[in-house]
Amino acid sequence: MLARNLLTDDGVIFMSIDDNERDNLEKLGAEIFGESNYVATFPWRKRTAKSDVPFGVSQDYEWIVCFAKTSKFIARTTGTERKYFETEDYPHQPWRIHDLTTQRTAAERPNSAFTMVNPKTGKEYPVNPLRTWAVTKETFAQYYAEGKIVFPDDYPFLNISKPAFRYWKSDDMKKAGEMFGLMPVSTKLPDNIGMSLDGTKEITDIFDGKVFSYPKTVELISFFIDIISKIDKEAIVLDFFSGSATTAHAVMQLNAKDGGHRKFVMVQLPEPCDEKSEAYKAGYKTICDIGKERIRRAGEKIKQEDDCWKCVPLNRMDGSKPGDDTTAKIVKTIDAGDGKPSIEMVDISKNPDVGFRVFKLDDTNMKDVYYSAEEYSQTNLEDLESNIKEDRTDLDLLFGCLLDWGLPLSMPYRSEKIGNCTVHTYAPGDAALNVPDALIACFDSNVPENVIKEIAKRKPRRAVFRDSSFASSPEKINVFEIFKLYAPDTDVKVI
């Protein structure tokens, strides 16, 4: 139920299972998501046949069951582009042809059962009584005048024997919208998906050792992410059982490939590694440690791959050179064939985003300060001076506030000194574009008025302090008055 509630209306869930529990999983999925939202079950061949198996039958497949939250989900993949023609009579208007007949008989559609005549040549094309024309005798002239009917003699290169419909590419694009060029997905997975051994090889190559057994391949996970995010390349991908973080690897690799901005959320219990395993000996105490390190190493590998760089001429059309870009980085020069260096590999855009943050679930930052009267004593009054737990850092408090305000945890932040106080700015804005900072926080004790004024003058959307930032109640009240003066629209909070 949690997974369903987290999905967007066009969201989808993929669940991997073996033969033993496939039936039960599909029944459970139908109960939670509804039978009508069952999408498909994809068979993934995870290994080659084994010989020492019960009944002499090797169960080589794993099943990936897919359910959608609603009928708004549509899977799409890149297909072979339709063949369009461009001719002199219709310059810059690509077109294609389509069958001009229907499955209706002459008895069913008598008004479409007529002999079609080419107005240019007078050649006749009798109707097939079992497949009448898609136009009527009355509408034929209009369709022909609009250029929507093509005869065999019009374009010999078509090699057709009967009239055909002409469809314009512009109409196809208008009708399909953002789905243009995409096609439905088959449950037959592509040949490059690989098996479990390929997944093991991938992670072994990354770590120079076998630190995780039988992970799924990056290509397998990439395939599923790709078919659900062909249109929405800013989708959020959540993996409840992230393991070695193959999903994170796949998201970063796919983003680098198609320029997407997909985000990943990996969830994993800190399951300890076997002390006899290679992973433990290599210093990875938990599966989480393996996943974090894989994301780091995979990210660095992706940044180094040539696919992340673009080829541009040494002398660009605008007259600038690659070195003119402040972000440009020349990687190598390519010989174009004449012995002269004519192309360089230059980074002309941002590097792939391979950053990530690690969070550990914990209880609240606040102390349990609700005591009954008999629980109070002179000895525990000192413990009640602060309502925040002693082991909490500024970042603990900052990200706790983000959760309270419902802000995303993936935005950039910076810390700086204003006077002697540490001030944190989360999701910095842009003064030139009149975009305010999302949040400014200061959790120091006894924050002076000049620091508060400086924060207020920046007019952030939100500002937060801790109770101990002020020596007295009047000072706390003064903070709100300062913001009313300098930044009346700022939401101020004291924790």
Locate each region found by the language model.
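Cysteine-dependent PTP/DSP-like catalytic domain, specifically the C-terminal lobe
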Residues: 1, 40, 49-52, 223-234, ...
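A phosphate-binding catalytic loop at a beta-strand-loop-alpha-helix junction
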Residues: 234-254, 402
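Long, compositionally biased intrinsically disordered regions
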Residues: 408, 426, 430-495
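Short, surface-exposed amphipathic charged segments that create phosphate/polyanion-binding patches used
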Residues: 53-60, 280-281, 371-378
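Short, contiguous acidic/charged loop-to-helix segments that flank catalytic cores in large enzymes
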Residues: 206-213, 237-240, 254-257, 278-287, ...
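Class I S-adenosyl-L-methionine
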Residues: 1-236, 258, 269-277
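Conserved helicase/translocase motor-coupling segment
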Residues: 406-423
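Glycine- and aromatic-enriched alpha-helical transmembrane segments of multi-pass membrane proteins
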Residues: 388-406, 410, 463, 473
